[in-house]
Amino acid sequence: DHIVSPHGFSYTSASLSPYVYAPYTYAASPYINPASVAVAPVNVATSYHAQDVIGQASYGHVDAYQAHHAVQDAAGNKVGSYSYVSPEGKVVKTNYVADATGFHVASNALPVGPTVVPAPVVDTPEVAAAKAAHLLEVEKVKGRV
């Protein structure tokens, strides 16, 4: 006793009792959400390069999982940075300077040294005795000269 309309409305018939007046009513049909379609992400990559006649340059590239940017002066010195996503999913960021003194880098992926300064090495009793005997001999030789 329920008719679904192709236009998004549904209708109900009047009451079957001859003694009760029931007007026709309508209500919107339930909305059925179509199945979602998975769309692969689009990998957008860009790159740039600009250089003047004396060798100064700015260049780099960016894509979904890595980026690199650098500037170079006329003497060939470079300052730049790059980043990428490691296989573990960590974003690795690196800044660098390359000049006449070498390649200098700062990165969140470099090993970190110990925070506590190690205790000085203490000579064993045998080493201390050998050093004392050696210094005594050195003083004897100095006295002869």
Curated annotation (Swiss-Prot):
Organism superkingdom: Eukaryota
InterPro entries for this protein: CHIT_BIND_RR_consensus, Cuticle_Struct_Prot, Insect_cuticle
Keyword presence, Repeat: yes
Keywords of the record: Cuticle, Repeat
GO cellular component: chitin-based extracellular matrix
Domain Chitin-binding type R&R, residue spans: 41-114
GO molecular function, one term: structural constituent of chitin-based larval cuticle
Protein name, as recorded: Cuticle protein 7
One of the Pfam families matching this protein, by short name: Chitin_bind_4
PANTHER family: CUTICLE PROTEIN, PUPAL CUTICLE PROTEIN EDG-84A-LIKE PROTEIN
